[in-house]
């Protein structure tokens, strides 16, 4: 009798774990998208100045942070000094380092 109760308890725990994992509210990728600022969706903006500064932007189509050449003035908000700042603000992974 004790063995059948133990088996039943284990089966219920496995079932509850499976149900909890498949619940839509448990999808953290949707939560990250909902918390991403709108400016993360903007394309990279070089600006009118002529400097050639490597910066990072969040590429919403690719879902990762990539480099671009920034001219040095009139920066928009999807312009980060480091890949870590880009990822912290907009999420995603660090992508290929080639310029777009």
Swiss-Prot record:
Gene3D superfamilies: Pancreatic trypsin inhibitor Kunitz domain
Family matches, as Pfam families: Kunitz_BPTI
Segments forming domain BPTI/Kunitz inhibitor: 40-90
Cellular location(s): Secreted
Top-level taxon of the source organism: Eukaryota
Prodomain residues: 22-35, 94-100
InterPro entries (UniProt xref): Kunitz_BPTI, Kunitz_BPTI_sf, Prtase_inh_Kunz-CS, TFPI/VKTCI-like
One GO BP annotation of this record: negative regulation of serine-type endopeptidase activity
GO terms of molecular function: calcium ion binding; molecular function inhibitor activity; potassium channel inhibitor activity; protease binding; serine-type endopeptidase inhibitor activity; sulfate binding; zymogen binding
Signal sequence coordinates: 1-21
Known function: Inhibits trypsin, kallikrein, chymotrypsin, and plasmin.
Protein's recorded name: Pancreatic trypsin inhibitor
Organism: Bos taurus
């Amino acid at each position: 009798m004790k063995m059948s109760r133990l088996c039943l308890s284990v089966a219920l725990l496995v079932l509850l774990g499976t149900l909890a994992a498949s619940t839509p509210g448990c999808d953290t990728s949707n939560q990250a998208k909902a918390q991403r600022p709108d400016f993360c969706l903007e394309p990279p903006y070089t600006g009118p100045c002529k400097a050639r500064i490597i910066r990072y932007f969040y590429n919403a189509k690719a879902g990762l942070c990539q480099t671009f050449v920034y001219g040095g003035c009139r920066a928009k908000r999807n312009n980060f000094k480091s890949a870590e700042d880009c990822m912290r603000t907009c999420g995603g992974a660090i992508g290929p380092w080639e310029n777009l």
